[in-house]
Amino acid sequence: MQKTSIVAFRRGYRLQWEAAQESHVILYPEGMAKLNETAAAILELVDGRRDVAAIIAMLNERFPEAGGVDDDVVEFLQIACQQKWITCREPE
């Protein structure tokens, strides 16, 4: 995954707030995965148009006290891709 990679939810997967879980979850055909606040903040920005660099920039602006989230965001998005929650493609 590169910072120029564009990430999107896979077909059948979606992020939503689950009141019963009191957290955001990824819903998918086989079940769901409960997310922590950090994971939810990252995935809320995944829209199929933004690249990884744009997501990082938005999070750095939103959470300046974090002191730079670049590596953490890339690592999490790689895990989300390995879990098959999202897809990753290079721009055309």
Swiss-Prot record:
Q: Where are the transmembrane segments?
A: none
MF terms per GO, please?
quinone binding
InterPro entries reported in the protein's UniProt record: PQQD, PqqD_bac, PqqD_sf
Its domain of life reads Bacteria
A biological-process GO annotation: pyrroloquinoline quinone biosynthetic process
Q: Which Pfam families match?
A: PqqD (PF05402)
Q: Which pathway, metabolic or otherwise, does it act in?
A: Cofactor biosynthesis; pyrroloquinoline quinone biosynthesis
Which keywords, in A-to-Z order, does the entry hold?
PQQ biosynthesis
Assembly description:
Monomer. Interacts with PqqE.
What job does the chain carry out? Functions as a PqqA binding protein and presents PqqA to PqqE, in the pyrroloquinoline quinone (PQQ) biosynthetic pathway.
Family the UniProt entry places it in: Belongs to the PqqD family.
Name of this chain's protein: PqqA binding protein
Q: Which organism is it from?
A: Klebsiella pneumoniae (strain 342)
